[in-house]
């Protein structure tokens, strides 16, 4: 059924390093792979396999800050790590789920920073930080995009994740009724948060 949405964008988030904390911004360039710099970097293990909070929950403590020509990463007990937008090192091949993806290694300093912070005491890990190769075309699963060719970088599935304040409010009402604490929108790692629409109307948007 046709319907009109009078929605406004209330919040914008990017997640420069896959599975690390996001950063809220007032504006961001929309590109064919999603918001600029979203999931542009990723942590991989010694075999080039992607690493996420599913294996290492401490990744959530790594907080980015976007500056003019760099992203700055901070974590408890660590010196800040500065990643220049225009700096990469050798080309590598890495894996995200079933996809083999072209990327660039970000060098030994970044690798040591992530290895030091994310390793458990007595269990050192060899981790590397890589950046997506912009010449590589990684398609979202056509099964989930209804046949539309949607490009993304290191995201799990889609160029953008859209949520709404209405859906969050409805969820928190149900949580409260069940005796649970409310959750914030950050729990769902959206890129775009919409205001002014009913719960779950974002699922009906044909963009």
Task: Give the role of each language-model region.
Residues 1-207:
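Small-residue-enriched flexible connectors and coil-helix boundary/helix-cap motifs
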């Amino acid at each position: 059924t046709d319907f009109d949405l009078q929605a406004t964008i209330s919040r914008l988030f990017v997640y420069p390093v896959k599975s690390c904390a996001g950063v809220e911004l007032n504006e961001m360039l929309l590109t064919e792979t999603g918001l600029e710099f979203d999931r542009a970097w990723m942590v991989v293990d010694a075999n080039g396999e992607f690493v996420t909070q599913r294996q290492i929950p401490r990744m959530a403590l790594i907080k980015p800050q976007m500056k003019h020509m760099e992203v700055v990463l901070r974590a408890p007990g660590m010196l800040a790590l500065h990643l220049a937008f225009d700096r990469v090192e050798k080309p590598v091949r890495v894996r995200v789920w079933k996809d083999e993806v072209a990327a660039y290694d970000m060098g030994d300093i970044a690798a040591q920073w992530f290895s030091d912070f994310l390793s458990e005491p007595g269990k050192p890990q060899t981790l590397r930080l890589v950046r997506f190769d912009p010449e590589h075309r990684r398609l979202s699963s056509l099964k989930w995009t209804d046949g539309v060719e949607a490009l993304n970088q290191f995201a799990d599935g889609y160029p953008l994740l859209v949520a709404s304040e209405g859906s969050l409010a409805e969820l928190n009402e149900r949580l409260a009724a069940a005796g649970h604490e409310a959750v914030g929108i950050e729990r769902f790692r959206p890129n775009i948060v919409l205001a002014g629409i009913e719960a779950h109307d974002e699922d009906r948007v044909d963009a």
